[in-house]
Amino acid sequence: ERRQRIDNNPGVILQEMVLSELWKGHPYEITVIGNMDEVAALTPADGMAFYKEYYSPENAILVVAGDVTPEEVRALAEEHYGVIAPTGTAHGERKWAPVPPLTETKELVYSDPKVRQPSWSRYYSGTSETRDRELSYALDVGLEVLGGGMTSRLYQSLVEDQQVAISANTFAWTTLHDEGPALITASPAPGVALEDLEAAVMAEVEKVIDEGFTDAEVERARNKLAAQAIYARDSQSNMANTFGSTLALGGSVDDVLNYPDAMRAITTEQAIAAVREVFGSDRHYIEAHLLPAEGDS
């Protein structure tokens, strides 16, 4: 799985390098999939020990989606899971210090023959719904305006007007338990150097930070995010995953149900304030360049 999903994907390799720096000193620095040396050293006994430690009723959340009643679900749960005895290994909510903010700016470059399209990215220290729900929601709206699609500031400026990029996006990992990165990323148009692309991207970001958003832009972003959350309810499996992950992170059912209204409540001032807080000129970041390299792909 690691060879297929990571080692064979230059973009994911670079991202793994960046996240290791971003989360240095935090448990997130340890990747879930591990490295090849760790995987090769695992034994069946290691797997069984992990299973016994964590795969117990005390550490489980059961989410059932579909045309069923609570009574039917309870009967089925008692039939299939009731025989599984508690193991006494309940871990409860894990608590540790927040992700330490970046204290210096770094640049990482990764080249690979498999790369067909260069890309430029900046990773900033962000936030999460668990750590700061209000800031997280405001950041979601702000990044939607800044780089959330073809109507965003970055796309219109870099792709449509200046034609220095073929893509330009911003997004943040706000659904982790602890602080995830907030990203600005773009791919250059043919013949455009990464340093010229970077200058164009950051000029637009700085313009937004200086001038702010319009009410119309923020209203459009709010409505889009709220609508996406509502349309997602059409998928039973998606809602099961959403409820399960929210509960596992310490959230509630109400957090999921109230999300559309929470998006609509974000003001223009909150949205631009979140962007300024995360992408301000005084904030450190990790810049990542993904480049092609000569050789066999």
Where are these regions (language model features)?
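Zinc-dependent metallopeptidase catalytic helix centered on the HExxH motif
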Residues: 135-137
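Helix N-cap motif at beta-to-alpha junctions
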Residues: 66-71, 190-193
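A common structural junction motif
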Residues: 79-88, 202-212
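C-terminal soluble interaction/assembly domains
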Residues: 209, 221, 232, 251-257, ...
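Hydrophobic side chains in well-ordered alpha-helices
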Residues: 73-76, 154, 197
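Non-catalytic beta-strand/loop surface segments
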Residues: 5-59, 83-130, 144-195, 217-224, ...
